Amino acid sequence: MCSLPRSRQTGPPIELPHNSTLLWASNLRRTREAGMGLFSRRLVPFEVTICGIDELGLHCEGRVTHVLSILDPGWPEPEALSAFDPHQRLELRFHDVIEAGAGWMAPQQQDVEHLLAFGRDLAGEKEPHLLVHCHAGVSRSTAAATLILTQARPGRPAEEALLTVVRRRPRAWPNLRIIELGDALLGRRGEIVEAARAHYRRVLEREPWLIDQMIEGGRGREVAEAGKLS
C-alpha cells in the first residue's frame, strides 16, 4: 500500500508549496485519474512526472522506471520510494539556494552534469518513465525537469520545455543556479536562462507579494532577473 510520509523543510521558503499538502495531493489524484498526469509524447520521448516528497506515495503504482531525487544534505531517504517497483535512481544532495553561503550547499556543475547524464541514459531505454522530485516539487525538481526536457528535444525552443513543466507544476519556480549551469552545459547560450527570466517575470507580475518573500529567502537575484527589484 502506498503512503504519504510527512516532510520537513530545512531550506529557504521557496520550496514550501503555497497550498496545503492535502490540496496538492487531491489535485494530483484528479489529474492522474483524468489521464493528464504525464507529459505528452509529442513534446518528449518519455514520460515525466514531477512531485514533492509528500506526493511520492501517489506514484508508487505508476510504473516509474527512473527516479531523480534531489534532497537536502542529511535528509533521510524518503520511505515512500521503498514501495516503488524496481527502478533506476539518481540521488543528488544540495540545498535549494542559488548562492553558496554559510550552512548552505549550493548546486554545483557536477550535480547538473549527473542529472543530464541520467536524462540521456533513460532516453535510450524502452518506454521509460522518469519521476523527478525534490522536497516540494517547486524549485530544484522543476529546474532539473526543464533541463532534461530541453536536452531531450535539442531542436525545440527551451521555453517550450519550461512551459511544459509549468503546465504540470503551476507553482514552479525553477532554481536559477541549476538553470544557469545547465544552459552552459547544453550550449544554449542563455536561451534557458531567458525562458526562466520570463517565467519569473510572469509570476511576479501576477503575484507581486512574492517579491519580498523571495528576497528574504535569499532569492533576490531571481527577482532581479525578472526586472522586479525596486
Regions inferred by a protein language model and the residue ranges of each:
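Intrinsic-disorder-associated, low-complexity terminal segments enriched in Asp/Asn/His/Tyr and depleted
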Residues: H18-N19, N27
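Glycine-rich, flexible N-terminal cofactor/catalytic loop recognition
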Residues: G37-A83
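Helix-loop module immediately N-terminal to the HCX5R catalytic loop
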Residues: R93-L130
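Catalytic cysteine-centered active loop of the rhodanese-like fold, especially the PTP/DSP P-loop
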Residues: L122-A152
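PTP/DSP superfamily signal
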Residues: A123-E127, T150-S230
